[in-house]
Curated annotation (Swiss-Prot):
Alphabetized InterPro entries for the sequence: Ribosomal_bL35 (IPR001706), Ribosomal_bL35-like (IPR021137), Ribosomal_bL35_CS (IPR018265), Ribosomal_bL35_sf (IPR037229)
Pfam families xref list: Ribosomal_L35p
UniProt keyword terms in alphabetical order: Ribonucleoprotein, Ribosomal protein
Protein name: Large ribosomal subunit protein bL35
Gene from which the chain derives: rpmI
KW Lipoprotein (keyword) present: no
Organism the protein comes from: Phenylobacterium zucineum (strain HLK1)
Domain of life: Bacteria
Length: 66
């Protein structure tokens, strides 16, 4: 049986924690930030842990993990 391919877009955008959870950057932070207040910008800095429902779908695109 041939090897399964990993989705290359997924391996670029997500990281896996030591416990197996997925982390990703927050969307909506590229431009037009003047309309958002400082609290929104501060809270969406860095990465966030994905929900279990989303992580299950994303892990199906990573047959061998990251």
């Amino acid at each position: 049986m041939p090897k399964l391919k990993t989705k290359s877009g997924v391996k670029k955008r997500f990281k896996m924690t030591a416990t197996g959870k997925l982390k990703a950057g927050v969307a909506g932070k590229r431009h037009r930030l003047i309309s958002h207040n400082g609290k929104y910008i501060r809270q969406n800095r860095g990465t966030k842990v994905m929900s279990e429902a989303d992580a299950k779908i994303i892990k199906s695109w990573l047959p061998y993990g990251l």
